């Protein structure tokens, strides 16, 4: 049964009642980590009928994928607070990049790029400022690229990469990034197509040992709660189930 192999996850959160970091760590991040959904796949595509905020862009001009590492990186839970409420107060949170964690997301990204017509991959980095983890990321990208000789690849520091998303979105095909950088880019990309309101997101366990999870990118919109105007399953052609949960 297809419904036993995947999870449809609606937007969650009510910032006025519960801080976002609590609702996120207590729900979505638990799914990602406990089900080893290490790939976050975000298609970025300008759809017919949705005007892009970028000048002279039409459907077909913006069409690429963002692959985000989804279970480690900058969003690790390793860290803490010392000397709270004193002048010596210190907070720390460590970035974790394992070889297996980095390589498996890079392998997925290169394989996807190899299946596309453009056969091009872009890596997001910041190795000119983050002096340990990002040079390691670059090293693993270069090593993985040797296994995919047909794929052309390049890398950009995250700041200028954001600028290119706005100025030259048509140049991209597959973009691969660490957890934090991928999180930023996967909102910026859909925004360039006119709205994040219809942007999809997949949290994937490619080996299918665990179910994958699919969600909208947009927020929970608590301001329209109780009005009966949110059609949460219509977009996946499930009107019957929509009626059940409405």
Walk through the language-model features, giving the residues of each.
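Single conserved hydrophobic/aromatic residue that forms the stacking wall/gate
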Residues: 3, 235, 242-245
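Short pre-catalytic strand/loop immediately N-terminal to key active-site residues, enriched for Gly-Thr
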Residues: 220-227
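N-terminal glycine-rich phosphate/adenylate-binding segment common to multiple enzyme folds
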Residues: 1-92, 180
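Glycine-rich phosphate/diphosphate-binding loop of Rossmann-like nucleotide-binding domains
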Residues: 86-158
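Glycine-rich phosphate-binding loop
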Residues: 4-19, 144, 150-208
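A generic local secondary-structure boundary/capping motif
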Residues: 51-57, 110-113, 162-166
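Acidic-glycine-rich active-site phosphate/pyrophosphate-binding loop
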Residues: 204-218
């Amino acid at each position: 049964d297809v419904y036993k192999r995947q999870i449809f996850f609606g937007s969650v959160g009510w910032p006025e009642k519960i801080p976002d970091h609590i609702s996120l760590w207590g729900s979505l991040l638990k799914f990602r980590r406990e089900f080893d959904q290490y790939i976050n796949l975000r298609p970025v595509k300008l759809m017919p009928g949705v005007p892009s905020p970028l000048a002279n862009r039409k459907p077909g001009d913006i069409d690429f994928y963002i692959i985000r590492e989804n279970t480690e990186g900058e969003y690790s839970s390793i860290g803490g607070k010392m000397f709270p409420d004193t002048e010596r107060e210190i907070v720390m949170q460590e970035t974790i990049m394992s070889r297996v964690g980095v390589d498996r997301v890079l392998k997925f990204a290169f394989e996807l790029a190899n299946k596309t017509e453009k056969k091009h991959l872009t890596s997001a980095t910041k190795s000119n400022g983050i002096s340990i983890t990002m040079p390691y990321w670059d090293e693993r990208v270069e090593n993985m690229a040797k296994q995919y000789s047909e794929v052309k690849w390049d890398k950009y520091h995250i700041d200028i990469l954001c600028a290119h998303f706005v100025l030259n979105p048509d140049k991209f095909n597959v973009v691969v990034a660490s957890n934090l950088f991928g999180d930023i880019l996967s909102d910026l990309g859909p925004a360039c197509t006119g709205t994040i309101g219809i942007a999809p997101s997949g949290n994937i366990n490619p080996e299918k040992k665990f179910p994958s999870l699919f969600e909208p990118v947009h927020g929970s919109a608590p301001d329209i709660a109780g009005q009966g105007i949110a059609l949460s399953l219509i977009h996946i052609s499930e009107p019957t189930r929509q009626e059940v949960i409405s």
